[in-house]
């Protein structure tokens, strides 16, 4: 039964998606056009910003959208009827997708990606889109936070062995690179995505030879650029002295790039190792630290004066250790009506943050021309032009008394056309371009938004028309519920 050769991603799905698809098809509403927004509600890691990522893999999926023969055989085996399966056999994606680009700064309650497609298609891609964007955005955000703390220090992604399976390791390495890391230990990620690779050797290498001096010398015989792992036996009494000894003996035959500390009191050991290296004349040799690092650990080590030049970050990056789920959702906001236009849809909840914003919308970043900084993100209905309102009024969507007026601004549409009527129309940037785009984007928000602790909340506001439309729909649904309640009495 376990065969991947004919495996598509169409069944990488929640069962209820296929159940709903069958019901839509049976009721002959499956071709109705529908609009869904993908977004998250709360900022991950208590961060002041997040970083959108995952579009490359979304495109990979959509380009191969379609049920395989083995998919259909399996669906038949669990009870789906031949007439429905016959329809699925020829199903292709014919919808449109607008999305932020990879490396875009993003914030809670704004559409990262918008799908406009026949209802059955839009429903069948929900689970995998969420699966992709939730993970990629989470890890890229974590990586960017670590980059902010590390400043100009080198950052190496070491998470493959601790990742939640093979795909998470591969795509997590890519996410980390876009988020600001300099390299990865994952050789496959280097091959597929052009990410620089880096690595040293393991404790097992030293243990194999039973002696650090011998092990380091054997390593140097085949590797000119040497980074020696010095904590297998005793960092200061054995590891560092033997690394220095080998480097002195081999001289110009090797490039003594650095030593790596993977255990113990990194702050103390790095300071002592730095002193020993400097006294031996190796002032340019770098000290690399690893061992359960993240932005908090690096902040602490820097505060203690640790003499670390490069950081190898693994487990706590690749798993999103302190918040392993982004919590993005995919919500219906409009559906085709009998007249062929759209009727807005809203979901209500006793939790205010779970009330959706109905209608087809655009998201703009409002840049103050005087400061060059972002004043906030501005969500409008699709037919609105933010330049029509001068000055532009930004107000908090809940605490509406919080407002400001912007006279001189640029409104940047954050969504790009990715698919139009089933055709890919977007040229995917390279990983290096996405990485640089993020670096530039971070310059557009205030330092207060990037603070590690208690960052200033970045405004995400609705236009007056969008706000009015939302509250109109809330009132309509409330009236409908009231009528139903009266009918049931």
Annotate each language-model stretch with its function.
Residues 204-375:
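Glycine-rich phosphate/ribose-binding loops and adjacent secondary-structure elements
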């Amino acid at each position: 039964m376990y065969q991947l050769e004919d495996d598509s991603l169409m069944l990488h799905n929640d069962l209820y998606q296929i159940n709903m698809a069958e019901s839509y098809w049976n009721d002959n509403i499956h071709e109705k056009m529908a609009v869904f927004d993908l977004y998250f509600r709360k900022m991950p890691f208590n961060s002041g910003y997040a970083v959108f990522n995952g579009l490359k893999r979304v495109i990979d999926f959509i380009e191969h959208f379609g049920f395989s023969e083995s998919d259909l055989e399996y669906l038949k085996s669990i009870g789906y009827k031949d007439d429905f399966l016959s329809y699925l056999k020829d199903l292709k994606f014919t919808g449109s997708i607008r999305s932020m680009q990879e490396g875009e700064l993003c914030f809670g309650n704004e559409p990262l990606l918008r799908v406009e497609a026949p209802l059955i298609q839009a429903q069948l891609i929900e689970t995998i889109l969420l699966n992709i964007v939730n993970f990629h955005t989470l890890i890229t955000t974590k990586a960017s936070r670590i980059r902010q703390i590390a400043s100009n220090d080198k950052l190496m992604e070491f998470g493959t062995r601790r990742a939640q399976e093979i795909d998470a390791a591969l795509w997590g390495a890519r996410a980390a690179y876009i988020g600001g890391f300099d390299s990865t230990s994952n050789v496959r990620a280097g091959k597929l995505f052009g990410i620089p690779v880096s690595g040293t050797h393991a404790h097992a290498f030293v243990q194999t030879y039973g002696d650090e001096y011998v092990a380091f010398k054997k390593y140097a015989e085949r590797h000119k650029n040497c980074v020696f792992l010095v904590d297998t036996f005793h960092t200061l009494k054995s590891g560092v002295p033997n690394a220095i000894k080998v480097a002195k003996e081999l001289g110009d035959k090797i490039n003594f790039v650095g030593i790596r500390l993977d255990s113990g009191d990194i702050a103390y050991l790095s300071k002592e190792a730095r002193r020993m290296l400097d006294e031996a004349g190796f002032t340019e040799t770098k000290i690399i630290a690893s061992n359960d690092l993240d932005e908090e650990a690096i902040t602490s080590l820097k505060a203690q004066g640790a003499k670390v030049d490069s950081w190898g970050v693994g487990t706590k990056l690749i798993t999103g250790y302190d918040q392993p789920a982004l919590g993005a959702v995919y919500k219906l906001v409009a559906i085709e009506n009998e007249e062929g236009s759209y009727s807005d849809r809203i979901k209500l909840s006793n939790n205010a943050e779970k009330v959706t914003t109905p209608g087809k919308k655009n998201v703009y970043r409002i840049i103050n021309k005087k400061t060059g900084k972002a004043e906030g993100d501005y969500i409008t209905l699709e037919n609105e032009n933010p330049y029509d309102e001068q000055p532009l009024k930004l107000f908090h969507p809940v605490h509406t008394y919080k407002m400001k007026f912007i006279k001189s601004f640029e409104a940047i549409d954050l969504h790009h056309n990715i698919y139009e009527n089933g055709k890919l129309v977007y040229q995917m940037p390279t990983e290096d371009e996405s990485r640089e785009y993020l670096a530039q984007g971070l310059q557009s928000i205030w330092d207060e938004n990037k603070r590690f602790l208690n960052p200033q909340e970045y405004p995400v506001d609705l236009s007056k028309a969008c706000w009015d439309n939302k509250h109109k729909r809330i009132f309509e649904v409330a009236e409908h519920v009231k009528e139903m309640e009266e009918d049931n009495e």
